[in-house]
Swiss-Prot record:
Coiled coil regions, renumbered to chain: none
Family annotation (SUPFAM superfamilies): ACT-like
Family according to the record: Belongs to the UPF0735 family.
Record-linked Gene3D superfamilies: 3.30.70.260
Native source organism of the sequence: Halalkalibacterium halodurans (strain ATCC BAA-125 / DSM 18197 / FERM 7344 / JCM 9153 / C-125)
Residue stretches making up the ACT domain: 70-145
Protein name (record): UPF0735 ACT domain-containing protein BH1214
UniProt xrefs under HAMAP family: UPF0735 (MF_00707)
Domain of life according to the entry: Bacteria
Length: 147
């Protein structure tokens, strides 16, 4: 199987059908339209053109921002430390998908967080730095990332 190549193309360089496909996909993803027929009708696109382009055109933010990262965090066992760390993640507008905490041993617990960074207001390294700078945090490692 050959690897697909991706190109960054300015919006005004796209064909009208490609632009309308992106509009129709946005209507479907937002829930404003539930059926493909409704979405293509609203934007003035044929269904055949939609199906031709739907798997080939994506908004730039989708290609760059839809990432899930996994962080491993060593945290001191203090009242409110986990809550404060999660508040830092929330302030960055990241979405916690999973959280796993070991039982604190010798005053330390390991937290594993899976985070969706698609809507995050910070870069990943900035979030890691913010978490690392917290008083109760001993260590933060990015152990996985992908889309």
């Amino acid at each position: 199987m050959t690897r697909k190549k991706f190109y960054l193309v300015r919006e005004d360089m796209l064909t009208e059908a490609m632009q309308k496909t992106l509009e129709a996909k946005a209507l479907l993803e937002s829930g404003k339209k539930r059926k493909i027929n409704e979405a293509v009708h609203e934007v003035g696109l044929s269904r055949s053109a939609f199906y031709k382009y739907k798997d080939g055109v994506f908004p730039f933010h989708t290609m760059t921002k839809e990432k899930i990262i996994t962080l491993s965090i060593n945290l001191e066992d203090r009242s409110g430390s986990l809550s404060a760390m999660l508040a830092t993640v929330a302030e960055a507008e990241a979405n916690v998908l999973t959280i796993n905490q070991t039982i604190p041993l010798q005053g330390r617990a390991n937290i594993t967080l899976s985070i969706d960074t698609a809507t995050m207001s910070l870069e990943i390294d900035e979030l890691v730095e913010k978490i690392e700078s917290m008083e109760a945090v001993e260590k933060v490692e990015l152990v996985g990332s992908g889309s």
